[in-house]
């Protein structure tokens, strides 16, 4: 089995061995923790997979809808986490479809992170102090 370092991010498709749209049951033999979210605006199930250091969000039927990388995210042999956002735009010739500012509590302190959506690529990039902090991977076509 290949690991995230070998496979990385395939936009609109997968991260490592985890495929968008697939059922989470395929992955539950791996070490993980599970959380349930039932908010007023959404509900989902979140799994954190320790080896890959990723969070996987699922619909109530178990279908993977989002993969979240906060420690490591390989894309075209480059780790996006910690990369300067301006370098990301230049290196991959990308421009966001939309952007927003969201206040996030990190380690008890607030950060106003810039959130950029790249809808055609199924990517949402969270940036603080011009460095990529989190990448959300989704399939806009699902």
Where are these regions (language model features)?
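Short acidic N-proximal helix/loop "leader" segments that mark the beginning
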Residues: 1-10
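Short, recurring structural edge motifs at helix starts
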Residues: 12-17, 73-78
């Amino acid at each position: 089995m290949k690991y995230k370092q070998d496979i990385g991010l395939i936009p609109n498709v997968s991260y490592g061995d985890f495929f968008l749209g697939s059922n989470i049951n395929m992955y539950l033999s791996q070490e993980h923790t599970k959380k349930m979210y039932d908010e007023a605006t959404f509900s989902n199930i979140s799994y954190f997979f320790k080896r890959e250091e990723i969070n996987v969000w699922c619909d109530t039927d178990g279908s993977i809808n989002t993969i979240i990388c906060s420690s490591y995210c390989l894309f075209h042999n480059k780790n996006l986490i910690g990369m300067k956002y301006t370098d990301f735009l230049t290196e991959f010739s990308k421009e966001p479809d939309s952007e927003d500012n969201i206040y996030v509590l990190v380690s008890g302190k607030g950060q106003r992170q810039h959130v950029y959506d790249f809808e055609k690529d199924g990517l949402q990039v969270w940036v603080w102090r011009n460095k990529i902090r989190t990448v959300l991977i989704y399939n806009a076509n699902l």
